[in-house]
Regions:
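ABC-family P-loop ATPase nucleotide-binding domain
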Residues: 1-25, 233-235
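ABC family nucleotide-binding domain
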Residues: 15-17, 22-227
Length: 235
């Protein structure tokens, strides 16, 4: 792709997430280790995209770079029109707070807070006066209207992940990053969680970026990006 075409793609307003020549290297006792090399991609608003690959292929590293959780050694990433490589950590955190939601394999709920209080957290940090009302509404959407006052220890694994999903969606993010979101769940519960994620993806047009080792799960996405030894290869 010519440089002018790449620039046009990076400036396309329908593209919510883009990378150009992303690379990540780390030092090791054996020398410099390349975790990612020359990764370029674009993801449009409302798409669901799976990032797949073997363990150690660089999936979670790519997610961290695209979300601004880590800095690349080379290349750049643009999220919702913001060039992350030109921002410091505070600037990247501000972009994440405004445009991104996260769901991980571990639920990362605050054990001393109820379901509704966990979901309210990002809204309270943003000083939203309607935090409780908005949290209650999104908990209803994920099927937990009757569990808003329960603590994480009183919820099943699937219910805890639903709370995490509600927290991720409550600020209506442009992009939801999900890193092995069913990894701690049994197969039946995991399928229900993914039904919920894909349903919210379609209903809200929030872009879903899913890191998974499960090819059947990846096949449910609009598109698959496969990594092999830190490089994008045909899927």
């Amino acid at each position: 792709m010519a440089a002018s075409e790449k620039q046009a793609l990076m400036n396309d307003t329908t593209v919510v997430l883009a990378a150009e020549g992303l690379g990540k290297q780390v030092s090791s006792p054996e020398g410099t280790l390349a975790i990612l090399a020359d990764v370029s991609l674009s993801i449009r608003r409302g798409e669901s995209v799976a990032i797949i690959g073997a363990s150690g292929a660089g999936k979670s590293t790519l997610l961290a770079l695209l979300a601004g959780l880590d800095e690349p050694t080379s290349g750049r990433a643009v999220l919702a029109g913001n060039d992350l490589t030109r921002l410091d950590e505070d600037g990247r955190a501000a972009v994440r707070a405004s445009h991104v939601g996260f769901v991980f394999q571990s639920f990362h709920l605050v054990p001393s807070l109820t379901a509704i209080e966990n979901v309210m957290l990002p809204l309270e940090l943003a000083r939203r006066p309607d935090a409780r009302e908005a949290a209650r509404e999104v908990l209803g959407r994920v099927g937990l209207a009757e569990r808003v006052g329960h603590y994480p220890r009183q919820l099943s694994g699937g219910e805890q992940q639903r709370v995490a999903i509600a927290r991720a969606f409550v600020r209506q993010p442009d992009v939801l990053f999900a890193d092995e979101p069913t990894g701690n769940l049994d197969a039946a519960t995991g399928e229900k969680i993914m039904d919920l994620l894909f349903g919210l993806n379609r209903a809200t047009q929030t872009t879903l970026v899913l890191v998974t080792h499960d090819r059947q799960l990846a096949a449910r996405c609009d598109r698959i990006i496969r990594l092999e030894a830190g490089r994008v290869v045909p899927s």
